[in-house]
Amino acid sequence: MKDIRIAIDGPASSGKSTVAKIIAKNLGYTYLDTGAMYRSATYLALQNGLTEENVPEILDQLSQNPISFGKAADGSPKVYVGDVDITHPIRDNQVTNNVSWVAAIPEVRQELVSQQQRIAQEGGIIMDGRDIGTVVLPDAELKIFMIASVDERAERRYKENIEKGIPADLETLKKEIAERDYKDSHREVSPLRPAEDAITFDTTGVSIDGVVEFIQEKAKKIIDKG
C-alpha cells in the first residue's frame, strides 16, 4: 500500500470540501483546504483595504501572517493567519464575493501554490480547489472534477448559511454562484477546467455518502495497486 495524492476540483458549492474532509478522515489522510488559503488572502486584503492595485502589499500581508491549519477539540479543521483564528470570518459573504479577484492575481497564486506543493510532497494528502489537478498537483494519482447544477449548489449554500446563522437569500445565491462560475472559468490565470486525466462526476441529486463512496472506491483501487 502507498499513500497517494487526491485532487478534487470543481465550481463553487459543488460539495468538494465536505467530501474531501470525510475522505481524509476515512483514509487517515491530511486535508489541505486550498480554498481556505485563498479566502485567507482575501480576508487579509479586505481587512487592510487592499485591491488588485496593491499586489505587493497583499504579498507582504501573506508573508507577515502565514496561513496555517489546526484542529479544534472535536477534530474539525481550524484556519489561522498568524495566530488569529479566522475559520468563520473567511466564510462571510463579503469574502466569498471577493475571492475571485484575489485568486486571479498571479503572484498570490504562485505563493500559495508553492506552499501547497511542499506540503503534498510526502503523499497521504487530499486537496480541493479550482486548479489542483491542472496546476497544483498535475501528477496526483487521482483527480476528480465535481460538478452540480447552479440550483442545487445554491440550495446547499443556502442551507449551510442558515445553519451557521448567516443571513441568506436563495435567489441572490443563485445569481452569485452563476457569476462566480463565469469569473472562475474565464479568468486568464488557471481558469476552472478539468485536467485531461480527471474523472468528471456530476453530483446533482447524489447524496454526500454516495459521492464519498464513489471517490473512495477509485482511491482504494490505486492504493491497493501500490
From Swiss-Prot:
It is an enzyme of class 2 (transferase). The keyword Transferase applies. It is found in: Cytoplasm. One of its GO terms (molecular function) is dCMP kinase activity. Its main location: cytoplasm. Pfam families: Cytidylate_kin. The keyword ATP-binding applies. InterPro entries: Cytidylate_kin, Cytidylate_kinase_dom, P-loop_NTPase. Disulfide bonds: none annotated. GO terms for biological process: nucleobase-containing small molecule interconversion; pyrimidine nucleotide metabolic process. SUPFAM superfamilies: P-loop containing nucleoside triphosphate hydrolases. Keywords: ATP-binding, Cytoplasm, Kinase, Nucleotide-binding, Transferase. ATP binds at residues 10-18. It catalyses: CMP + ATP = CDP + ADP; dCMP + ATP = dCDP + ADP. Its EC number is 2.7.4.25. GO terms for cellular component: cytosol. Belongs to the cytidylate kinase family. Type 1 subfamily. NCBIfam families: cmk. This is Cytidylate kinase.
